[in-house]
Amino acid sequence: MEDRIGIVVGGGAPAREGIDLARPLINNEGHLDKIGIAATRLNATIVREALSDAGVSVSGTIPNRVDEAVLLLEERPVVVMGGTTPGHTTDAVAIRFAIASGADRCIIATNVPKVFGEDPKTNPEAESHDFLTHDQLQEIVGPAEHSRAGASQIVDPVGVSEANISNMTLNVLDGRNVDLIRAAIVGGEFVGTVVRGA
């Protein structure tokens, strides 16, 4: 069987802006999450259409659930999806998709080069990590709970907990560098943080 790739697209600025716009009107975090999820699905559609136009054999629809994505991955080598349900971010969706599809690792593309012990935007002296255990990463990101719609961390705490339970390797890297993503996918030299079980 040829290699298969599942891509889970986050909401980014459109999700945060939509949530911020709605927050004065909506007090329910689950309802605000739905706004973020809609943004992830829009972004996923953009990525899916771009890949299709480039000639990539990508699934024709954006799945709503991880089990649906796994079935689509049996039909096409590339599946693109966004968020699913309130209570977690697309990091958790990506980790669940990787686990359910039997992947050997889940690549988390972020906007920093590695996992840091503290936010490098607020502490320029924060220490970066090449390797961490799931437990160490959980300590950095906090307990496995969803705190607030639109919240952003290096990796979703809910997803970290699920990766730990399933012993799913996480490769956290700077998603702004396409060459790093390519190397992580094809097994080239990895630059980022590898997270594994103890």
Regions found by a protein language model. Give the residues of each.
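C-terminal catalytic "cap/lid" subdomain
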Residues: 1-198
